[in-house]
From Swiss-Prot:
The gene is def. The lineage of its organism: Bacteria, Pseudomonadati, Pseudomonadota, Gammaproteobacteria, Enterobacterales. Keywords: Hydrolase, Iron, Metal-binding, Protein biosynthesis. CDD domains: Pep_deformylase (cd00487). The keyword Iron applies. Its EC number is 3.5.1.88. GO terms for molecular function: metal ion binding; peptide deformylase activity. The active site is at residue 134. Binds 1 Fe(2+) ion. This is Peptide deformylase.
Length: 169
């Protein structure tokens, strides 16, 4: 297992559209395991492969408090969505920044699990929001893309300043 480097804005690799996984094999399972290690090390609740410079349609999520409810979504497809909600979202690729983002309240998706088995999942609340957030990453979209240009610029400047401070430390 390994902790991978998480890309931060303004890194353009975050805008690359992920490719479908052709076969779930040992390499894909290793990527999934490394992504969980990375997500937990960074204290996140979700991570898309794009965020660790792997441009495959892979997402890992764990919104549980005890960190024991791992959800793997390989090649996820949105089947249905309904309702409206929104919370202040954060993102490991946009450290220490949050903003209110409009999302569907409920979603139904189809995906492959860590073993390559197809399944469908209906989600609501935080899990539904997290799924939508991570699926956005797979198409090169970030939560700040939902914000006004002024708010986007302010967040970019704050993240760049944080990265400069971390580099000096």
């Amino acid at each position: 297992m390994a902790v991978l480097q998480v890309l931060h804005i303004p890194d353009e690799r975050l805008r690359i559209v992920a490719e479908p996984v052709k076969e779930v094999n040992a390499e894909i399972q290793r990527i999934v395991d490394d992504m969980f290690d990375t997500m937990y090390a960074e204290e996140g609740i979700g991570l898309a492969a794009t965020q660790v410079d792997i441009h495959k349609r892979i997402i890992v999520i764990d919104v549980s408090e005890n960190r024991e409810e791992r959800l793997v979504l390989i090649n996820p497809e949105l089947l249905e969505q309904s309702g409206e909600t929104g919370i202040e979202e954060g993102c490991l690729s946009i450290p220490e920044q949050r903003a209110l983002v409009p999302r569907a309240e409920k979603v139904k998706i189809r995906a492959l699990d860590r073993d390559g088995k197809s399944f469908e999942l209906e989600a609501d609340d935080l899990l539904a929001i997290c799924i939508q957030h991570e699926m956005d990453h797979l198409v090169g979209k970030l939560f700040i893309d939902y914000l006004s240009p002024l708010k986007q610029q302010r967040i970019r400047q704050k993240v760049e300043k944080l990265d400069r401070m971390r580099t000096r430390a």
